[in-house]
Amino acid sequence: MPHSNISSTPRQQLTERVLQAKAANNLTWASLAEDTGLSVVYVTAALLGQHPLPQAVAEVVAERLGLDRDAVVELQTIPLRGHVEDVSSDPTIYRFHEMVQVYGTTLKALVHEQFGDGIISAINFKLDIRKVEDPEGGERAVITLDGKFLPYKPF
């Protein structure tokens, strides 16, 4: 039976334990997600407190991290999502806020022009990030946001 958190505290505390264990065991997000059948993005988001994990995956990941049975149960609990304090103070996260501030109205206009009145789902959603070489030198981040379009329906 699925359980749900009504406070962000349990997942925040577990996230701290996950980060400590990840560092202590010299693990990567990719190594934690390996052979789980889930994407590295989804497993990372779950371990950072934004998604529940299926029982089998929670058990595998907890074992890799050396976490106890209580952590396995908490990893399966539906979290209070999006409840992250002070996200705008982190420079990396703030750049994403800045991108939406600058391009949000453009994205909205183009989505509506191409799809009509509606939204892009963050529930039926996939996210991918990859590093590519920049022809002008250095590296670039290619971030793909892949969400299902959900039209508004008159009633």
UniProtKB/Swiss-Prot annotation:
Any idea which UniProt keywords this protein has?
Lyase
- Please provide an example of a Pfam family that matches this protein in its UniProt record: Cyanate_lyase
* Gene3D superfamilies found in the cross-reference section: Cyanate lyase, C-terminal domain, lambda repressor-like DNA-binding domains
Q: Which residues form the active site?
A: R95, E98, S121
Which Gene Ontology molecular-function terms are recorded?
cyanate hydratase activity; DNA binding
This entry's Enzyme Commission designation comes to 4.2.1.104
* UniProt xrefs under InterPro entries: Cyanase (IPR008076), Cyanate_lyase_C (IPR003712), Cyanate_lyase_C_sf (IPR036581), CYNS_N (IPR048564), Lambda_DNA-bd_dom_sf (IPR010982)
Where would you find the membrane-spanning parts of this chain?
none
Q: Which reaction does it catalyse?
A: cyanate + hydrogencarbonate + 3 H(+) = NH4(+) + 2 CO2
Q: Name one GO biological process term.
A: cyanate metabolic process
Relate the protein's function as given in its record: Catalyzes the reaction of cyanate with bicarbonate to produce ammonia and carbon dioxide.
What the record says about family reads:
Belongs to the cyanase family.
NCBIfam families reported for this sequence:
cynS (TIGR00673), PRK02866.1 (NF002773)
PANTHER family tied to this protein: CYANATE HYDRATASE (PTHR34186:SF2)
What is the protein's given name? Cyanate hydratase
Which organism was this protein described from? Pseudomonas syringae pv. tomato (strain ATCC BAA-871 / DC3000)
